[in-house]
Each structure stands twice: as C-alpha cells, then as structure tokens.
Amino acid sequence: MVEYDYEQINKQELIWEDNNMSRLGMLYALNEEDVKKLRSVPEEERYEYMLEEIEEALIGSPRSCELDKAWEGIQYCLGGGQWNEDNCIPTNIVFGGEVLVETDDEIITLKNHQDVRDIVEYLHQNKLQEIIQKNFWNIDDENFMYKNDDGLEHTLGWS
C-alpha cells in the first residue's frame, strides 16, 4: 500500500500523465511555479516537457506517485466498475481536472488546489483499497484485459 503525505499534497496541484502506448500512469504534485512553466509550453510540446523536466525532477520523490498499469483498474473501480471520463472530482482522480494534453497516445490533466483538497477528503473518508475490492469484479470483461486475480492484486498493490 502506498503511503501519502496528504497534508503536503493538499498544498500542491496534481498532474496526471499517461502514455497510452505503455499504459503507465503517474501523479505529480506541482507547485505554482511548475504549473506556470508547464502552461507556458505550447500544447504540442507539453508532454515532452513533462517527461524531460517535471518527471526527471520529481520521479521517486514524495511529490510523485506511480500508478503503473493499475490506473486503469482504479479508474474503473472508482466508477463502480464502469468507465467514467466525466470530469467529476473527487471520484475521477485519473481523468478529472483541466486537460492540458490529449492525443491518441498521451494525456495530461491538472487538478487545482480545490480538486486536490476534494480528492484528499474523499480518500480520507473512503478507503481506496476497499473501493477496489468492492468494484473490481463489476468491471466488464470485454473492456478490461486485467480482470483476473493477478489484475486485482496488481491494482491493490499500486493503490
């Protein structure tokens, strides 16, 4: 189980990035300067900037959270077993927020301070692992290739 410093994260903005080619997901807590720099980069260059500047600086630090391939199962489980890309914070931790990059292969979304506070409060009130255990087997088999015992353990292990 991943441990988070919710008080510190609550003061930051979160950025979600996903490279659909490898299907790996990351969350980063950005300060205002990080967000300002990211927004100043042209949209078509933001993903590369995120990889080269933000990820390079933050990966492995307390300001990063790797979700590996578990992000997809988490997304389904937070939606009760259904895929939900509606911009509904706090239950759409993965895709909710402002879209900064969206292509066929990559997506970056930004959660503002209030979104982060709402997510933190939601996770304090609702145990993510319990949500996953409750909803994992409700995921449609046709849409989720990891719906098996190993997929459940992987999703729980990264949550």
Language model feature labels by segment:
Residues V2-W158:
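Acidic (Asp/Glu-rich) sequence patches and key acidic residues
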